[in-house]
């Protein structure tokens, strides 16, 4: 009887673990894709403001238009939701990693958390800086200073391209390293992540297409996690002490 009860408890724990892993993978995929989408939307709207190369007349006309200012302000309001989605993404990703393997480096895990936190903080600074002129004119009826109107968007772009994406590179590196070491991500994706991280870390580009690199990596990761979530058996019958890797046959539906 005691052996039967112990086996039943072990099976129940495994089933709960399987459901938890499936939920964590699904949530991670959803909020990761949501952050990528909201990030691109908010930055596209905020960067609509005239930049350093704009003439004084272009700057004056842009900020004199209420509709133009509100495009930037919509991007400003979307920005916090992108940040909230990323916070959920980081927490859910770490839950999935912790539940999927016991071979997890504390150093890599902490670096992943810290780099993700700094990345989203710098993204907030970049987007807020790029929209401060539109906000000040919209809410305080201030006058446009062309020199100031040029400086703030440049400052925002510098924070994003030079600082935020370096932290994103560290996040990509650590996520790839954790996934490769534990065997919970495909090897091609993990090694590709090292290339993406190196590109984000070393590139000196200020081109608008560069903004797409990190969100695209997130989209691919989200798609992989959705695939993983579908393959995890919610009634996983793998003893807890044996560990769990998403590639293991007992935990994966075939076909």
PLM region spans:
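Hydrophobic, aromatic-enriched alpha-helical segments typical of multi-pass transmembrane helices
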Residues: 2-255
């Amino acid at each position: 009887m005691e052996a039967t009860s112990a086996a039943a408890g072990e099976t129940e724990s495994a089933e709960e673990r399987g459901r938890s892993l499936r939920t964590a993978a699904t949530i991670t995929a959803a909020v990761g894709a949501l952050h990528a989408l909201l990030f691109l939307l908010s930055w596209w709207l905020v960067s609509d403001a005239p930049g350093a190369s704009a003439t004084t007349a272009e700057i004056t006309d842009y900020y004199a238009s209420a509709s133009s200012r509100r495009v930037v302000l919509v991007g400003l309001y979307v920005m916090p939701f992108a940040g909230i989605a990323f916070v959920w993404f980081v927490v859910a990703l770490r839950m999935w990693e912790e539940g999927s393997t016991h071979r997890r480096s504390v150093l890599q895990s902490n670096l992943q958390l810290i780099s993700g936190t700094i990345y989203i903080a710098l993204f907030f600074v970049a987007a807020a800086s790029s929209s401060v002129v539109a906000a000040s004119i919209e809410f305080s009826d201030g006058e446009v200073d062309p020199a100031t109107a040029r400086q703030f968007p440049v400052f925002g772009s510098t924070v994003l391209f030079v600082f935020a994406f370096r932290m994103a590179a560290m996040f990509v590196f650590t996520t790839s390293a954790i996934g490769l070491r534990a065997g919970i991500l495909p090897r091609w994706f993990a090694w590709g992540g090292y290339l993406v991280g190196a590109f984000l870390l070393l590139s000196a580009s200020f081109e608008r297409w560069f903004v797409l690199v990190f969100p695209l990596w997130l989209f691919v990761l989200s798609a992989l996690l959705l695939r993983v979530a579908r393959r995890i058996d919610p009634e996983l019958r793998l003893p807890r002490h044996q560990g769990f890797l998403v590639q293991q046959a007992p935990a994966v539906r075939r076909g």
